[in-house]
Amino acid sequence: MGKHYIPNSAHKEEMLKEIGFSSIEELFADVPEGFIREFNVPEGKSEYEVFMEMNEILSKNKTVLEMPTFLGAGTYFHYVPAHVKYLIERSEFLTSYTPYQAEISQGMLQALFEYQSLIAELVGLPVVNSSMYDWGSALGEAALMTVRLHRGKRLKFVVPKHTHPERMQVLKTYTRGANLEIVEVKWNDRGQVDLEDLKEKVNDAAGVYVEIPNFFGLLEENIQEIGEIAHEAGAYFVVGVDPTILGVVEAPGELGADIVVGEASYFGSPMNFGGPRAGIFATRNDPKFIRQMPGRIIGMTKDAEGKRAFVMTLQTREQHIRRAKATSNICSNEALVAVAAAIHIASLGPKGMQELGEVILKNTAYLKKRLSEVAEIPFDGVNFKDVLVKFEKPYQEIHEHLLQKNIHGGYYVKPHFPELGESALFAATETTRKEWIDALIDALREVL
């Protein structure tokens, strides 16, 4: 196959002449000779040859259908209806263009408006932005927002120690520059927020955070009481939620949340190595809250002819206003992921959302029951997706055995929480088959 050089020799000579050089070597004469080496790349290939080589490489991958995974801990295998992918691949949606010109972007803007409306209905708070980067970035922005709401007079944000470790890292990165102290609350003997410890640490806090479910997969039984403790201390109540549970539990807004964050990509997106994602961010319909909300909102208005129209509004981002006055330095969002989530949620409807939550609860309960036959379940309670399991043997050995059996085991927890010993989180979703769980237990019996 012949080579085609870009730019070609004539163009190269013309450019060199324009800048006063006779050769490429003269242009880069300042580069030490030791750093100049042969451009050692293989010969070019035809499209068919590239196709065959890539196909051979890709054939080494194993999907979750060929190798069932119980990994969980934030990334889950959910079924995405085929029409979701078809719709978001339309050129109106699949574009790098930001819809600044509302007059030519009504389709995208309305889709994002529908996303906001659906999330508002699910989380029980009326004001939703058009998404953040992910759950972690939404949490970081929520913490900073609580400080702004207190006009910088409170510089403490209280979180459960058992918040997802990676989400905790993002939170600390976000808040370090703002000198915001992250205070961790212990868990009790049931793996839930220790209310007495919370009461001791909540004074002078800007905000208090809790998750539904928590990192151990447990539903916190005292969400409303945690919110009351926060409000009594003058702190704002921030709730992080996995939205796939919202068809079977009360909305966080109904439980007293001032701000709700979460992960929208559980709807409409594959696991895809953990990304891209879309962070949920919702708050109360109060001018004080709305003005401090990060990101941007898609609003509905009327055009010059009195027809319904959608526009980007309240864009308090550094791209549009002075950096010192901006509520966030996020200059974009995850629009395509948010649209995919909206299509998926709308396709499910209220009944589908309820059925989704019920099936996940049922599969998680079966997984927990079977795991309890071969290992210790440290915490009692209702689990959603994740189940914490403690083993007597080193978990890495157990995991290697599972891989040999073509099963991907749980998420190793000990590096983050040494006090939990040889523990791992095993997860189930609506896609988890009974025979997968049974095969997992059989494999565990062999190694334990």
Swiss-Prot record:
Biological process annotations from GO: glycine decarboxylation via glycine cleavage system; nucleoside metabolic process
Functional note: The glycine cleavage system catalyzes the degradation of glycine. The P protein binds the alpha-amino group of glycine through its pyridoxal phosphate cofactor; CO(2) is released and the remaining methylamine moiety is then transferred to the lipoamide cofactor of the H protein.
InterPro entries listed in its UniProt record: GcvPA, GDC-P_N, GDC_P, PyrdxlP-dep_Trfase, PyrdxlP-dep_Trfase_major, PyrdxlP-dep_Trfase_small
Protein name: Probable glycine dehydrogenase (decarboxylating) subunit 1
Family of the protein in this entry: Belongs to the GcvP family. N-terminal subunit subfamily.
Organism encoding this protein: Pyrococcus furiosus (strain ATCC 43587 / DSM 3638 / JCM 8422 / Vc1)
Record keywords, A-Z: Oxidoreductase
Highest taxon, organism lineage: Archaea
Quaternary organization: The glycine cleavage system is composed of four proteins: P, T, L and H. In this organism, the P 'protein' is a heterodimer of two subunits.
Reactions accelerated catalytically: N(6)-[(R)-lipoyl]-L-lysyl-[glycine-cleavage complex H protein] + glycine + H(+) = N(6)-[(R)-S(8)-aminomethyldihydrolipoyl]-L-lysyl-[glycine-cleavage complex H protein] + CO2
